Each structure stands twice: as structure tokens, then as C-alpha cells.
Amino acid sequence: SVRDADSEKKSLFDGDEEWKVSHINGYLIAAPDVYVQPRRSPVSEWVPAMTFGSMANDGGNLILQPEEADFLMMKYPRLKEEGAIRPFIGSEEYINRKQRYCLWLLGIRPEVYENIPEIQRRIQAVKSFREYSPRAATRKLAKFPEIFGEIRQPEQGKYILVPRVSSWRRSYIPMGFLPAETIASDAAQMVPQATEELFGILTSAMHMAWVRAVAGRLKSDYRYSSSIVYNNFPFPDLDRESADDIHEKAARVLAIRE
């Protein structure tokens, strides 16, 4: 019967080891059926929000390969001086140390780029791409073809970049601080106004145990989401001594990386 089947012992495996347990839940652990639900904001009040990076929604026309960026900055030095070409980084670029750039014309005076044919061609291509989109929201963006479709980049300071997907073979998720001048793509997530204390907790064994338990998976790799993983994580309230200790150790890790 169904009741007899429910009462039978189940087998739970870890490598070559097998355990007999009474119940296996959706996280593949011997525990009751309790599931983490998505949240829109962190359960811990002291941590800043995690967001996606900025989405170009441009048909690839605002994105530059390193040689394209170098050519434009050499031919038109003012583009570099004004910050119109920025490093552009997502999960793959961060993890594999790849370089990409983007045209970042938000807040840049039109006189800086309006007479540059290479840029004007790209802007017109973005406009056409958006105008012919089946999505009404994207078509509206055709009015502003020189800028990204969704902009979430902090204007100053630094942020922690967190890859959306990373290998399960790693003992921790590779993440780190980047300056506001480096544009985070929507292929990654970021935490603006982040501190060394937050970095220390996010790269801790405690947080990784949480990731392994509740994060989604792509094949076997971790899919880190703000709504499930970050927002539900019970970040501990830190007294001054604990905060200073975490800050010191995180700063040491960051210094070794450099």
C-alpha cells in the first residue's frame, strides 16, 4: 500500500556511502519537507540588497571586445577621458578573467560621441533592434538607444560581484569587490554599498553550507539567487569585536588576491 511504501526506509548516498533514512526531502537530505520560499528583501536588516547587474538589451551593439575598445580609445582619446568606455563584467568574465568593455554613455555629453561614426552606427543599430522587438517595453527603450535598457550600476564606491552560476567543485563561490567604474552585466549579481564584513560572511564555510543546501542547480553547478539564497540567509548580528575580526580576515584575503 501507499502507507507501507511511505514507511519503508530510503537510501541516501554520498559517494560510496549509503544511509538508510525514513524520509528524503526536496533538498535530498534526511529531514522533513520544509522549503525555503523566495523573499524580495533580506531577512537580516543590516545587509544591503543584492540586485542583478545592468541589462544592455541592445542586440550586442553597446558591447565591445578588447581590441574594439582599444581602437576607439586610441583614435578618440576623449572617450577614455570622459569614461564613455568602461570594463564590462559578468559571471564568465569574472571567473575566467576575460575582458570585455561597453559603451557607457549615461551622463556623457552628446558632444563627446555624436561626431564619431563608429559609435553612431552602433547607436542606430540599438535603436533598430529595440524598435523591432516584440516586447512593448523594449520598443519604448528605442527612444534612448545610447544607454543600457536596464541600469542598476552604482554611481560611486564599490560593490561585491557574485556570479549567478559557478562550479560545484569550488570550495567557495568566487566573488569580490569591483569599483563602480566597472559595469556589472545582468549575467552576474551585485551588492552595492557592501562591506568587508559582508564579504567575509559570504565567503565563509557557514554561508557555503547554506548555498549547498538551498541554491538551485544548473547541471551540478550552483545557481546563486538573491531571492532564495541571499535574502533568506540568517546573517548574524555582529558586535564590534566580531565585526572587526571578520573585517581583518576579509581584508587579509583581499590583500593576498592582489
What is the role of each PLM region?
Residues S1-E8:
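Conserved beta strand-loop-helix elements of the APE1-like EEP
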Residues L12, D16-A255:
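Polybasic, glycine- and aromatic-enriched phosphate-binding surface used to engage nucleic acids
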